[in-house]
Each structure stands twice: as C-alpha cells, then as structure tokens.
Amino acid sequence: MGMPNQQEDAPGRRWSVEDVLALPNDGNRYETVDGELLVSPSPRYLHQAVVGAVYAALRAWVVAEGIGVVLFAPARVILDAHALVQPDVFVLPPVGADVMSGAVPAPAPLLVVEVLSPGNARHDRLRKRPRYQRAGIECWLVDAESQLVERWATDSDRPEVCMDQRAWYPDRASSPFTMELAPVWKEVGLPTVG
C-alpha cells in the first residue's frame, strides 16, 4: 500500500493498526486514533532537540529508579485495534525481552510526552491527548515556543500548566522526577521568556 490517497482516506473510513502498519516508510509519521488516520511530516530540528532533552532527563531518572524503560518515536504504542500512536517520548513499566523484541505487545505507557510543533499540534492536542487519557495514561504536552508544559492527568478536563519545573510522581518510584524547564529551553537555543 502506498501513501494514502483521497479515496483510501475517504470520510468515514476507519483505519486499523494493520492498515497503518502496511503504509510505506516515506518520512511521514502515520498513526491512527479511533480509526482516524493522522499524518505528520518529518519534525523540525527544534522539535527533535526538545525531544532529546526530555528523553535524556527522563531516561537518567527512570534508570536510576528502576521503574521501566524510556523510548521515543518512531517506536509504536498500540492502544487497541484502531489506535496506533508514536509518542515523542514515553515510559513503559519494566518489560522483558519478549516485549522489547516485539514478540508480545507492550503494556500501556506510564507517561507520554508529546512535543508540539506546527505539523502536529492539532493532532497531539485534539486527537492523541484525549485518547491517552481514556487509556489511563498521563500526558505532557511540551510547547517549546511558549516555553511551557501542560500536564494532563487521566481524569482531568484541564491541564496543569508549568513554566518553571515539571514533576512526575509514578507509583513505583521512591522519589518524584523533576525537570527544570529553563535549562531545556537554553539547551535547545531558545531565548528566555518572561
């Protein structure tokens, strides 16, 4: 199957995980949420730099706490038969070699982090974020241009907005993960706001 055309992506078509997995590796990110096909272009450098900074901070803490494994896109998360997503950064609980090799499905992530950019902000905010919440997954939306992080708890209809420090309190951890935001923005070359 080639890149989706208008007929394949006709209104009312319900995309499955299998449909998305059959799409080509052409530089676009293909996901489906509740059967809707989401296509995002390759990300900008700023997006990837922020992803890298968040990944590095989370990974160091998760490894030290021994609570799981941190992965990043294009790794896939399958939530159900009509929901395949590629979160920018996500934390899985401890998994074995069978999950890491793909022999068995991965459990739901403990945390998902999506970095907003012009090509994906609408999908991340309006499609993926509510889907994560319905699956019981905490979601952070990182807005580098506004230099803030929105924390969406699984049972919340409004985010907790943080501009200085973001914290995460997973059940299995002996202490919370905290990430100062100013060093992240500085690392990726953004001027200080406020």
Predicted regions and their residues:
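Gly/Pro/Ser/Thr-rich low-complexity, intrinsically disordered segments predominantly at protein N-termini
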Residues: 1-194
